[in-house]
Amino acid sequence: MGNLRKDYILERSSIISPSSVKKHNSKKCPYCPGNESMTNPSLLSLVAKDGMLQRLQDGEDFFVTDWSVRVFESKEPAVSTSTPNTYSDRPLYSEPAYGYHYVVVASPNHKDSLATISVEQWSNVLVVVQDRLRWLYTQKGVTYVSIFVNHGKESGTNIQHSHINMVSFSTLPPIIEAEAEASHRILNEKGVCPMCQAKDVEIAGPRQILQTEGFIAFCPWAPSYPFEFWICPKKHNTSFSKITQKEINDVSLILRATLGGLTKEVKDVSFNLAFHLSPEKKNSKQIHWHIEVYPITGHWSGLERGYGVFLNTISPEKAAEALGAACRKELASLVGIE
């Protein structure tokens, strides 16, 4: 299995994992109903019955059918719990790429996307994600759980059926570590959470896209991608695993409305989506959790790759204006307002 290596100088990580780049060659989609044998057995399958959601899982000789959300271990994992126990220090730093890699299939319908499923279905998906997140943090060797989406041909996915990846790590990913350290420093220096500060600035401002009762979506002041946007709780909150069903329903509404608006405003857009969550086991590394969406509308140049300076062809204010109109229309249709 793979190993996690670090840059000679920077806290930049690479997972060397040949098993995670296998091409899907079958004409059958392994995530569609009826093809459950093409994946690992489900650890959790949500099944609607008599108006209730049942939590089931595959057995040794049978597969759960009529599911609405399905979770299983990836057959092409980026990390593994059976990695060789080998370490080396800098300049050739290496450690086992230890962890769990789960796939959460968001809908039984192959043609559905995260921009078209119902708000209720989004809620079901997030309930499952929250369930797996809580379980993962009870496991030895799990320091952080990343939750991300690759949508579209340019996103890095090799299976188009809508799904969410959950990948755990034994160390903090560099971006989360840097974000946590910066948040902690600003909190100590200014006495305010930087995400709360950003939220207060962006509410009703020129970069706001949409807001619901408990969440706001906005294009960040210094985006890395054209049409990039973030979704964050209005109230200070560091734990996604503890949010209530009401909050799950609310964030599902704004996710569905903004992704629906994005895909209508930017035709055939691929995107990546990442949950930036606190590491549950490190109280000194807490962050105001939020979701970041990165539309892929072009290619990075040497400026971005070589220097970390991002060139944007549209201002976040203009992007928010266009996305806001599309997302408000999407929200109105979702809540039954014409």
Role assignments for model-derived ranges:
Residues M1-H161, V167-T238, K246, D268-N272, ...:
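Active-site microenvironments that recognize anionic phosphate/pyrophosphate groups
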Residues I209, I243, E247-D250, I254:
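Alpha-helix N-cap/loop-to-helix boundary motif
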Residues D250-D268:
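Extended C-terminal subregions enriched in glycine
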